[in-house]
């Protein structure tokens, strides 16, 4: 039987700004099983990142707030947990990889210490134990000369190498859920492919469930088991990756797929555009998106 790791029910997230209340996420439902990859796709501003940040309340201290809904992680509702309990989860049971590896790493801290940090904090490793484990995982993610470069700083690495370090840090404690927020966007195509292959390989080894946020449908086809399509703060369609690609039901999903160029596209071929504009989430339309 498939083990349910995460279940989100009727999630509503809002941001209070001078102009009013931005209803960034409006009634989102989804689930995540052990060892699977769920891709969340949609255009910028559709609510992808806010949805996943809400899981561990990473927008707390900002103007964001969960208005309504359940976030069940192994049966416990994270939406009701206080900050001091969520801190124990972040980096241990639920980890996150962000889009830009340069801003994800502390530029004044040696990369080895950054990978060691969650092990010391969450696993109570000694420094010697943490260093041994950090070297193991840096070698696992394919960082060249990991032992020699353990005391190097982030600026001394390429973009792809920095992202490998970020992945190593996120996976150090073998989390049950890994949230990857457009982790390949800042990389070239060759490096994107390497990072995606690496994530799939590591997922098999530690059986982590992945939520992969992207607007790149090619990446989705490569990595996802299931897909959730977001538009206007709502998940308008979810399904198996083949169902979404070959039998989309929602007009927005169809438009998103149809706007993607293929190998037969030439410079003279007009690309399909979705008419209109995304809904104003200060004044969202009534009903479904």
Residue ranges of each PLM-predicted region?
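Conserved ABC transporter NBD signature motif
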Residues: 65-77
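Conserved ABC ATPase "signature" region
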Residues: 74-77, 129-148
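Short catalytic/signature loops enriched in Gly
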Residues: 3-4, 144-147, 240-289
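A short, surface-exposed alpha-helical micro-motif characterized by mixed small hydrophobic
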Residues: 220-222
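A short, proline-enriched helix->beta-strand linker immediately N-terminal to the Walker B motif
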Residues: 172-176
